[in-house]
Design a protein with these regions (language model features):
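Loop/turn-rich, solvent-exposed surfaces of beta-rich toroidal or solenoidal domains
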Residues: 288-326, 338-347, 359
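N-terminal secretory signal peptides and thylakoid transit peptides that target proteins
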Residues: 1-15
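Short, solvent-exposed loop/turn segments at conserved positions within beta-propeller repeat blades
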Residues: 35-36, 86-93, 138-141, 192-200, ...
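Asp-box/WD-like beta-propeller blade repeats and closely related beta-sheet repeat scaffolds
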Residues: 109-174
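Beta-rich, blade/repeat-based domains predominating
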Residues: 61-72, 117-129, 163-181, 222-239, ...
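Short loop/turn segments immediately following beta-strands, especially the blade-tip
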Residues: 44-49, 100-106, 147-154, 206-211, ...
Length: 364
């Protein structure tokens, strides 16, 4: 059984960065990159035939945690760590590695030397022009920024002018499409019978040339019952979608010039029966389709793990038309994609269409 961090997939880049999978001629080659532990493997994707063909494998210094493509789509930046997930046993090997993508074949080759990180990275991304790499760490919660060298290798850390409040349990860091704000998603922790809830927040910074300043915290209700995990942006509208892990919600915030409006514009349930939770369920990754018409969210870890696809339009964004893909066989890991095999019949192997969750609607 693979854990969420042991197995991670980038399906033609569309999961890690939606803009990576913009509309392309059907004749263009499509590549899939997936990892098990420290091994990152390239697969050719036959879209018409729904087949995968295994190609080369690149070994990272430790288990892959996350990966993000350079804006040129010629390189991947891969965060790896030997630490256990969450607050588990701490390891000693934490890195960012650059990997070159052959523009003709999609083949992967290591590019330069990895850089060391202080602790386990939970998420990695770049700013819009990929001049800087942003890394989120969960234990302790923090965010750091590293330069991208002229040869596209990861470089030195950028010194920040002041202290940063990184909240509790950072889960993701992203730069807004205009490259003017950086957002650190901090989930907090659920309360227990013996411990009070740790509040969650969206930590919003002014961003310029790798420097984070003027931090503002968005924390409805003081961060209580607000456990954000992951966010994504609409490709053409000033809308930001945030999955709220601990409350199983999907929120939408409006982006304004130089700020995120702190008011929750719209919200939706991610569960069909939010008042009848039979096992711990948690809203996970969220991604907006490149055409802006669909928002995809993951619910985990109740077996089997599931996807939810919410349909949106310019005027009304509704989840009434959706598809659920269910991993098979059931497992308790949070991985979004089962392990591919050579010539498997579909980019997502061992999946089946299931019935849609009950209707929920988000209005513009």
């Amino acid at each position: 059984m693979f854990s969420r961090r042991t197995f991670l997939s980038l399906v033609a880049g569309s999961i890690a960065a939606p803009e990576f999978a913009s509309a392309q001629p059907s004749s263009q080659k499509v590549a899939l990159y997936a990892n098990v532990g420290a091994d990152l493997t390239h697969y050719d994707v036959d879209v018409a035939g729904a087949e995968l063909t295994k190609r080369e494998t690149v070994a990272l210094p430790a288990a892959v945690q996350y990966a993000w493509p350079h804006a040129s789509r010629r390189y991947l930046y891969v965060a790896s760590s030997s630490s256990a997930p969450g607050y588990g046993t701490a390891g000693t090997e934490h890195h960012v590695t650059a990997i070159r993508i052959d523009p003709e074949t999609g083949a992967l080759t290591p590019h330069g030397a990895p850089i060391r990180l202080p602790t386990r990275p939970i998420h990695i991304s770049t700013d819009i022009p990929s001049e800087y790499i942003l890394v989120a760490f969960n234990n302790p919660s923090s965010v750091r920024v590293y330069r991208v060298n002229k040869d596209f290798t990861p470089g030195e850390e950028v010194s920040q002018p002041g202290s940063i409040d990184a909240g509790i349990f950072a889960h993701q860091v992203r730069v807004t499409p205009d490259n003017r704000l950086a957002i650190l998603v901090t989930r907090g922790n659920e309360g227990t019978p013996t411990k009070e809830e740790d509040p969650g927040a969206l930590k919003v910074f002014n961003y310029k040339n790798g420097v984070l300043t003027n931090e503002v915290s968005i924390a409805p209700n003081g961060g209580k019952e607000f456990g954000p995990r992951h966010l994504d942006f609409h490709p053409t509208k000033p809308w930001m979608y945030v999955s709220i892990e601990t409350q199983n919600k999907m929120y939408m915030f409006r982006m304004e010039p130089s700020r995120i409006n702190p008011e929750i514009a719209y919200r939706a349930e991610t569960l069909a029966e939010p008042n009848n939770i039979r096992a711990r369920q948690a809203a996970g990754t969220v991604h907006v389709h490149p055409n802006g018409r669909f928002v995809y969210g993951q619910i985990a870890p109740r077996p089997p793990s599931s996807f939810r696809a919410s349909r949106s339009s310019r005027a009304v964004k509704t989840a009434s038309s959706c598809t659920r893909l269910t991993n098979r066989p059931a497992s308790r890991h949070r991985s979004s994609t089962p392990r591919p095999r050579r010539s498997t019949r579909a980019p997502f192997t061992s999946t089946r269409a299931g019935t849609c969750w009950s209707r929920s609607t988000i209005y513009r």
